[in-house]
């Protein structure tokens, strides 16, 4: 039976309940500290790699009356009031939007299927990143390098790792020996010579929504001890249905086994044209939309799947917006603000239902807010 909510609740700024993902190996303290949880016993001595700021399974909290509800139940209570009629018409009631705050070291060489293409069970996963601080990543392949040589290098590493994994599990080889042999092979074939290695700048936008583009986060503890600090927006698709790993960087699990790799599918999916691999086509900086009365709005992402703006408000200033055309998701990246009777706290996310209509945010201190919404 659908949840029954009054009009006041449908107009409330609903806070997204924190969902932090512990990652002892590649996470850090950035997300914990940003959310004001640094002194929490629950997170003492722990590292977090991601927080889900919005997902299909999100739970929401109404600060006005302490009520709680799942996102699915809130939408089901009145889809048009929550999402907005234009959003409902174009995207339907199942909002497959995933917003993550990430602190990550290196991950595997990956690719996602482009829209309109089919390959086995794989599905597209349009995504975009906004770098909050300098970092390191790879993006696209080098068009002046042999793709055949790249393919041979990845297959050679993958075949070797599978053989070494079997030997470790069979007791013929120690895990340390297998790791050493793998790193020696990786150094000799050097898969990085075939991809673009990019030093990320703060406020850099990486648009991967086209699909078919090789990408990875990279690790350099001397230059970037915090890893990659990224605000991600993507279509919500489980990794096992969208992320093809071409190279897992020589990583073994403690028992000598391997994470799944999909070298043939990865290579078959990579687009080899300039449109997909020229960095200038996909990497950009914020674009100013408006600036008045102490409030500045910049465009970050403009895609067919989602849009993202950054709103910067000076202390004591106000920002006015209108959600009637479709819901807004707000993440308070810095500072604190006020929306009606609700405090918008740093490190927290809020859902503004379409029924809210026009709303005003007053910055009690200098604030930076990310606003995600759907293009209608």
Q: What role is predicted for each listed range?
A:
Residues 195-207, 338-360:
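Short acidic-glycine-tyrosine-enriched beta hairpin
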Residues 179-242:
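Loop-centered beta-sheet repeat module
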Residues 1-174, 238-239, 246-281, 308, ...:
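Transition-metal
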Residues 172-189, 323-331:
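Short, basic/aromatic beta-hairpin or loop at an interaction surface
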Residues 107, 111-115, 133, 304-323, ...:
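Conserved short histidine dyad/triad with adjacent acidic residue
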Residues 102-106, 114-115, 123-124, 133-136, ...:
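Ligand-binding loop in jelly-roll beta-barrel domains
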Residues 261-325:
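Functionally critical, mid-to-C-terminal surface segments that flank or help form catalytic/ligand
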Residues 98-100, 107, 120-121, 127-130, ...:
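His/acidic/aromatic-lined binding-pocket segments of jelly-roll/cupin-type domains
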């Amino acid at each position: 039976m659908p949840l029954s909510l009054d009009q006041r609740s449908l107009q409330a700024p609903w806070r997204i309940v924190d969902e932090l993902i512990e990652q002892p190996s590649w996470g850090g303290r950035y997300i914990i500290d940003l959310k004001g949880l640094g002194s929490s016993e629950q997170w003492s001595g722990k590292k977090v790699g991601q927080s889900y700021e919005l997902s299909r399974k999100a739970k929401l909290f109404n600060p006005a009356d302490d009520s709680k509800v799942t996102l699915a139940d809130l939408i089901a209570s009145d889809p048009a009031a929550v999402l907005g009629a234009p959003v409902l018409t174009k995207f339907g009631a199942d909002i497959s939007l995933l917003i993550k705050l990430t602190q990550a070291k290196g991950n595997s060489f990956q690719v996602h299927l482009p829209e309109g293409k089919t390959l086995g069970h794989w599905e597209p996963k349009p995504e975009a990143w906004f770098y909050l601080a300098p970092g390191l990543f790879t993006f696209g392949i080098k068009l002046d390098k042999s793709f055949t040589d790249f393919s041979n290098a990845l297959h050679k590493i993958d075949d070797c790792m599978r053989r070494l994994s079997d030997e470790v599990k069979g007791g013929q080889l120690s895990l340390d020996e297998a790791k050493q042999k793998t790193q020696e092979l990786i150094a000799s074939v050097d898969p990085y010579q075939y991809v673009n290695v990019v030093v990320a700048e703060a406020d850099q936008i990486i648009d991967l929504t086209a699909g078919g583009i090789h990408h990875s986060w990279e690790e350099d503890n001397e230059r970037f001890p915090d890893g990659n600090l990224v605000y991600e927006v993507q279509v919500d698709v489980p990794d096992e249905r969208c992320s093809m790993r071409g190279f897992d960087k020589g990583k073994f699990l403690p028992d000598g086994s391997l994470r799944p790799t999909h070298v043939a599918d990865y290579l078959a999916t990579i687009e080899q044209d300039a449109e997909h691999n020229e960095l200038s086509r996909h990497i950009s900086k914020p674009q100013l939309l408006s600036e008045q009365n102490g409030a500045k709005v910049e465009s970050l992402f403009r895609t067919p799947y989602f849009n993202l703006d950054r709103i910067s408000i000076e202390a004591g200033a106000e920002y006015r917006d209108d959600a009637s055309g479709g819901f807004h998701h707000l993440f308070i990246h810095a500072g604190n603000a006020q929306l009606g009777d609700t405090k918008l706290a740093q490190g927290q996310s809020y859902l503004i239902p379409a029924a809210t209509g026009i709303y005003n945010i007053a910055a009690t201190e200098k604030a930076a807010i990310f606003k995600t919404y759907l293009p209608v």
